[in-house]
């Protein structure tokens, strides 16, 4: 079982839910990874998940971003059910981002600088 820990970035309370997983179940090769998971992520929260391999940590992120689809349940982002939205719509419509566990980062830059670099490249492409 994964341990899910939430932190708030600021000290004041914000109740606006931006991501909600409702009754999510997910199977991988007939093995149930998630069973009726319910999770709310509110604005200005940082979510950390700890646990051994195979308990669903990466699967949760893959479900939120649309890299995987749940077998059962709903994924709500900013109040919109996006369970069946294609991945490209989910990333562009909701401005989702994902930092890979391995690779994909320039090691000499901080995480913030890596994110800034990607956003600058994306903005420049749109301006062309």
Q: What spans do the regions from the language model cover?
A:
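ABC ATPase NBD coupling module
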Residues: 81-97, 102, 121
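Helix-to-loop junction immediately C-terminal to a conserved catalytic motif
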Residues: 65
